Amino acid sequence: MGCCYSGETDTGKGDQGEREHLLPQNQSLPNNKQNGSEQNPTNNPSARTDEQAMLSRILAKTAQNIIDVSAVESQGMEQHECMDRARQYSTRLAKLSSNLMDWKNVPPLPSLTSQPHQILASDPVPFTDIQQVSKIAAYAFSALSQIRVDAKEDLVVQFGIP
């Protein structure tokens, strides 16, 4: 049914298979044209057997790294173990749900309108209006950032109290 790829590699081999060349170093790639004519791979039986050998080696390495999940024996639980776990889960769930009761007492968000579907279905705000509001907000920010207070005299005045 299901299979998983095992990414584990044998530590004795290291990363040898990963860095191993598929073609031997002394063997170069064959030229497509030899003496002006194309080379047909079916005409060269040694190249075909080498290719088959490489494909077989890749297939064997892949088969070693696959774990058949359907063949793995499942752990059987006895009835009392199952009941214990169910009891544990229900107590944990009760603890967590008691914290959720605090959220039920929170009042809902204020309703700005009694018919939100009409607002959501209405035409969008024109882009020129959005630009105008942005421009006004920028002017207001600029004006507020330029406000300076100059202290010309003491703010606290001492009265003649004996």
Swiss-Prot record:
Lipid-acceptor residues (N-myristoyl glycine): G2
Topology term for the membrane: Lipid-anchor
Compositionally biased intervals (Polar residues): 24-47
GO molecular function: guanyl-nucleotide exchange factor activity; protein-membrane adaptor activity
Modifications the protein undergoes after translation, according to the UniProt entry: N-terminal myristoylation and palmitoylation mediates its recruitment to lysosome membranes, thereby promoting localization of the Ragulator complex to lysosomes. N-myristoylation by NMT1 is required for palmitoylation at Cys-3 and Cys-4.
Bias (Basic and acidic residues) ranges: 10-22
Subcellular location: Lysosome membrane; Late endosome membrane
Annotated spans, Disordered: 1-50
GO cellular component: late endosome membrane; lysosomal membrane; lysosome; membrane raft; Ragulator complex
GO biological process: cellular response to amino acid stimulus; cholesterol homeostasis; endosomal transport; endosome organization; lysosome localization; lysosome organization; positive regulation of MAPK cascade; positive regulation of TOR signaling
Alphabetized UniProt keyword annotations: Endosome, Lipoprotein, Lysosome, Membrane, Myristate, Palmitate
Lipid attachment, kind S-palmitoyl cysteine: C3, C4
Glycoprotein in keyword set: no
Subunit structure: Part of the Ragulator complex composed of lamtor1, lamtor2, lamtor3, lamtor4 and lamtor5. The Ragulator complex interacts with slc38a9; the probable amino acid sensor. Component of the lysosomal folliculin complex (LFC).
Function: Key component of the Ragulator complex, a multiprotein complex involved in amino acid sensing and activation of mTORC1, a signaling complex promoting cell growth in response to growth factors, energy levels, and amino acids. Activated by amino acids through a mechanism involving the lysosomal V-ATPase, the Ragulator plays a dual role for the small GTPases Rag (RagA/RRAGA, RagB/RRAGB, RagC/RRAGC and/or RagD/RRAGD): it (1) acts as a guanine nucleotide exchange factor (GEF), activating the small GTPases Rag and (2) mediates recruitment of Rag GTPases to the lysosome membrane.
Matching PANTHER family: RAGULATOR COMPLEX PROTEIN LAMTOR1
Family designation: Belongs to the LAMTOR1 family.
Name the record gives this protein: Ragulator complex protein LAMTOR1
Organismal lineage: Eukaryota, Metazoa, Chordata, Craniata, Vertebrata
Encoding gene (name): lamtor1
